[in-house]
Regions:
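Extended, highly charged accessory segments
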Residues: 1-154
Length: 154
């Protein structure tokens, strides 16, 4: 199928994982691609409305095991409106709260593999395939411990 390229000039926030982090978390390529990054992306989008005045439908996301510009596993959360609306920026400014709420929601959810309460998204272009709740939870826990209390911003 030949589809035209779509471009949206907007604002967003992202995180990358260095190789030593991937090794530390003992995630293999399949878990990253099929799971952890994608699950973390969905969970972060689902919980951003608790810290920014928006709806999950106002947001978009992308997760790649090797983004062409970063060269690293990368998750993007972006505003779904041209020019941005400030939602992802607000999430970045409230990073500790956003990460904490997201990690706690995924960790507390009683399901085993993922469900709409934790990592499934009603707007997933991949039909909520290739998700790993456990790898996503581990990534969120790592992000919270790395950025949460330190409030690191770049």
């Amino acid at each position: 199928m030949d589809c035209p390229t779509r471009t949206l000039q907007t604002t967003g926030t992202w995180f990358t994982l260095a190789e030593q982090v991937v090794n530390q978390l003992q995630l293999n390529e399949e878990q990253l691609l099929g799971g952890g990054l994608h699950a973390a992306e969905h969970a972060l989008i689902g919980l951003l409305p608790l810290v920014a005045t928006c709806d999950r439908w106002d947001l978009g996301g992308l997760s790649l095991t090797q983004h062409p510009q970063t060269g690293l596993p990368t998750v993007f959360i972006y505003d779904g409106t041209p020019g941005g609306a400030g939602f992802s920026r607000h999430g970045f400014k409230q990073l500790e709260t956003w990460l904490d709420l997201t990690y706690r929601q995924v960790n507390a959810c009683p399901c085993k593999q993922g469900c709409p309460r934790c990592i499934h998204s009603p707007k997933c272009g991949n039909g909520n395939e290739m998700l790993s709740k456990s790898a996503g939870r581990d990534l969120l826990e790592f992000l919270l411990s790395s950025f949460g209390s330190a409030g690191t911003a770049a």
